[in-house]
Amino acid sequence: MVSLPRLCALWGCLLTAVHLGQCVTCSDKQYLHDGQCCDLCQPGSRLTSHCTALEKTQCHPCDSGEFSAQWNREIRCHQHRHCEPNQGLRVKKEGTAESDTVCTCKEGQHCTSKDCEACAQHTPCIPGFGVMEMATETTDTVCHPCPVGFFSNQSSLFEKCYPWTSCEDKNLEVLQKGTSQTNVICGLKSRMRALLVIPVVMGILITIFGVFLYIKKVVKKPKDNEILPPAARRQDPQEMEDYPGHNTAAPVQETLHGCQPVTQEDGKESRISVQERQVTDSIALRPLV
């Protein structure tokens, strides 16, 4: 009769032999099928039939619009990804038989996940905050509050905090202190303001006084083109005495016409023709016999 320890050892050897017979090791690019190691299909292809004792694994290339990125034994390839424009996506890299389509976001947006399934608008840094890191295709803008001595007065996707203006460097004084959103306001010192204001005021007063004198002079100056009345134009410097029998008629001009004196009435012009004047001149120059 077999003892119990021997029986246990016998069953252990039997189970070990059975287990070793079924434990077949395949390589990284193989898979176990019906006790045999079959080759996996390479990237860009799919499985059509498993291997047998007489034939190797049968694979077929992926169709257009499909891909397989790894060594596989799948009977179907994967569809290329579609970049949906309504979600703000665009194609960054076209897909191939071995790789999927790569999508990214449009300008001004970034992916909300690692797979870039959706997009979101870049977040601008509000006034009082500056840009620490600008947004990218996969990350949003990183903002930080402006420290003391710096400011940001606008919402921006790229502006950093700017330092306050140094009034001392410009020989000015601080009129208003700066904040995280506003710059320092500089101005002239009190003494300098007085030195500048006094000459300006004096210049304005002198200009006004000069204009006043000029207007006054122009108003008092008589007009050159003023027309005197007829009585003033005809008045002689000295009054003429009236004598009895004084003839005030204008002098009468006499001319010769055909060796006879001709009296020309006042206010009338001489009407002697050129031919008559030549005859008169020839008679006057003829010597007497």
UniProtKB/Swiss-Prot annotation:
Residues 1-19 form the signal peptide. Disulfide bonds join 26-37, 38-51, 41-59, 62-77, 83-103, 105-119, 111-116, 125-143. SMART domains: TNFR. SUPFAM superfamilies: TNF receptor-like. GO terms for molecular function: signaling receptor activity; ubiquitin protein ligase binding. Residues 20-193 are extracellular. It holds the Pfam family TNFR_c6. The keyword Calcium does not apply. TNFR-Cys repeats lie at residues 25-60, 61-103, 104-144, 145-187. CDD domains: TNFRSF5 (cd13407). Residues 228-251 are annotated as: Disordered. One of its GO terms (cellular component) is extracellular region. The chain crosses the membrane at residues 194-215. Receptor for TNFSF5/CD40LG. Transduces TRAF6- and MAP3K8-mediated signals that activate ERK in macrophages and B cells, leading to induction of immunoglobulin secretion. This is Tumor necrosis factor receptor superfamily member 5. It comes from Mus musculus (Mouse).
